[in-house]
Amino acid sequence: MKRSLLIGVAAFALLAGTAGLAGTAGAADLKFKPGEDSRFNWASLEEFKKGHDLKGQTLTIFGPWRGEDEALFKSVYAYFVEATGVELKYSSSENYEQQIVIDTQAGSPPDVAILPQPGLIADLAAKGLLTPLGDETKQWLLDNYAAGQSWVDLSTYNGKDGTSALYAFPYKIDVKSLVWYVPENFEDAGYEVPKTMEELKALTEKIAEDGEKPWCIGLGSGGATGWPATDWVEDLMLRTQPAETYDKWVKNEIPFTDAAVTGALEEFGWFARNDAFVDGGAAAVASTDFRDSPKGLFSSPPKCYLHHQASFIPSFFPEGKVVGEDADFFYMPPYESKKELGNPVLGAGTLAMITKDTPAARAFIEFLKTPIAHEVWMAQTSFLTPYKSVNVDVYGNPPLKKQGEILLNATTFRFDGSDLMPGKIGAGAFWTGMVDFVGGKSSADVAAGVQKAWDSIK
């Protein structure tokens, strides 16, 4: 799926570790000394410490983070170890999706698993391999996460008996609803950052009228060619339809041929299928590699002024380009005419769940409810949170803070739709359908083809 694909290229996961790495932490590993930096909510750590004595116990956690991200996660759980006295062992695997299935079904699960695939979590819950986190945690998410109902919805699955319950805790989020630009180019041309989709469209037309190309769009990605267009469609779907319609779409409760879906395709086509709007013309969209696509922002003169992509894309900016200085981004705006849809955010992220019900596992979920469990990672890199009680000034750099504020201002959050669909669709027919669409095939024909593929796996 797309999430797995991007783990290998994201700035948030540049370094790979060795399969089966295990990590322990103690007080000597604390990145920031408790009480010394007033930006951090040390009181939340002290309060947590009072009620959790786990000396003599061991907590095992299995997750997707390796290399640099593993070291960052270790810097967080070091505070859990210091507060509780528990021995904590973290491990991962290059094929972590398969490994967690093997371990849980074999009866040798970790105490806590952290995964970025809601579909896989749903499978584990349906097999009775997860422990419900309870109504208290559900209420906590509603009260403490911005767009709280969205996070409850994302974390709720059907158990083995078919009863729905909260099985997961969202922790470490990625934002996809971003449009990238070069401030100097905007300043030179007299352009302003749009606040609505109508303004974004007007800016697109203005740039074209000025004889320039507004957008750089590239769908090329080897065997995964087409996936960047699915993010476009998902973002536009959330800005033209209620979130409930989006939810029905990703579950195939409404077909791809529904007007809500083809309408989002057409909105993407407004940008991508107009030769005047895209560097290289519409014919170049499918063949341009997504990694090369943003480079046009930095050409002199610019080959384009706008680029839609998730938070990882600076990994592929030309060497030496600094986000916040040489490049910046803005939230992909909502439609003025659709104010009732609020400020939707498309993204991805990881969710923690209890795969072996132990006091230490339950304590770890409680630890994730403390601001300090978020702020320690925020202060470094590669971490965003919708937790309303954190101090956003802790973020390690202004771009991270800006993305964090986008999450906090969201009225709705939805997970990447193609990652919620069956692999044959979300990492297959949807991708190839988008290539056909930018190549000139009608939205109706593309939608019919994807739906036919979905019907074949029922």
Curated annotation (Swiss-Prot):
A family per Pfam: SBP_bac_1
Keywords: Periplasm, Signal, Sugar transport, Transport
A single GO cellular-component term on record: periplasmic space
Principal localisation: periplasm
Secretion signal span: 1-27
Locations listed in the record: Periplasm
Main function: Part of the binding-protein-dependent transport system for alpha-glucosides such as sucrose, maltose and trehalose.
Family membership noted in the UniProt record: Belongs to the bacterial solute-binding protein 1 family.
The protein's name: Alpha-glucosides-binding periplasmic protein AglE
Organism of derivation: Rhizobium meliloti (strain 1021) (Ensifer meliloti)
Gene: aglE
